[in-house]
Amino acid sequence: MSRPIAHDYPFDPTYGYDLDALLAIPAPPAPDDFDPPWQRLHDRAREVNVAPEVGSQEADHDGVRVFGVGYTSLDGVRLGGWLVLPDGPIDRGLVIGHGYAGREAPDLPLPVPHAATIFPCARGLNTRGRVPGIPDDTDRHVLHGIGSRDGYVLRGCVADLWCAATALLELVPSIGPRLGYVGASFGGGIGALALPWDNRFVAAHLTVPSFGHHPLRLTMPCTGSGESVRRYHAAHPEVIDVLRHFDAATAAARITIPVQVAAALFDPAVPPPGQFAVYNALHGPRDLVVLATGHVEDAESVVEQQTLLAAQRRFLTAHLNRW
C-alpha cells in the first residue's frame, strides 16, 4: 500500500497525513442551499433534447466497435465523444468521464463486459468538447466563470454527464435506466457532483477524485487544477462561497448508490485529504481501494494500476449485475 517515494516537489504530496488521519477527514459543512440548485439543474438537463448522432465506425478493438458520437448538452452546447458497443449481447450501460487533460480516444478495454459505453468530452476540454469562449487549458478552464455559482464552468460539466447519459439511453434503449459511472481525477470529482441527483446511475467508481473539501484544498499547494484555484482564492477569498457549492465531498454525502473510491496516499496533483473526504462522506454501500500514489507514473504505479482495474471490474460487475 505505502512505499518510500523519492520526489523533488517543493511540497510534501502526502501533506503530512497517514492513512488513519485521512480516514478521519469529514466533509466540510454544506451551504444551507446546497441541494435545490443542483436538483433544479438536473431537472433542466433532463429536459434537453440531446439529439444524439453517431458517426462512422472509427475502430474495432478486441470485441468492441468504436464510433464517434455527438450530443447536445445544457444551454445548447454541442459536444462530442465516443460510443463503444461490444459485439454480442449488451445488458448494461456506462458513462466514463475523463481527467482534466480531456481525452483523445476512449479508454479500452472497457471496465466491464457487455456494456454500451459513452465516453463524453466535457465542455471546453480536449478533444471533442471544445466550445468557443471556454478555455481548453486546465489552469484557465477551472477558473472560467468562477465568480458566480450559476456561471461556473463546472456546473455545465456536471450537466454534460447527465446529458451524455440521456444520449446513451436514447441510442441504446435496451439497457434501460441502469447505468454505471466511472471517472478519475476531474472525472471523479465531477461524477461525485453528478451522482446524487440522477437515479439512472446504480453504481460508480471514482479514482483519485478531485474537488473534495475545498476549505482544505485551498491550503495545499499542488500541481493540478487546484493550484490555480488556490492562487485565485488568495486574491479573491470571497470565491469560497462559490466553491462550497461545488464540493465533491459535500455531494458525496448525498450519494446512496454503491460507490468504489480509489484514493491515493501520495498525490502531487490532487491532494489526498480531498480524495479521502469524498470517500469518507459516502453514506451508501462503499468500497475503498488505497493507492500508494496518484498522478505518478513509475514501475510500481503500473503494477498498482492493474490491481486497481481488477478491483474496479469486480465491484462494477457485482453491482451492475443486480439490475
Model-derived segments and their meaning:
Residues 1-63:
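N-terminal targeting or regulatory segments adjacent to alpha/beta-hydrolase or S9 domains
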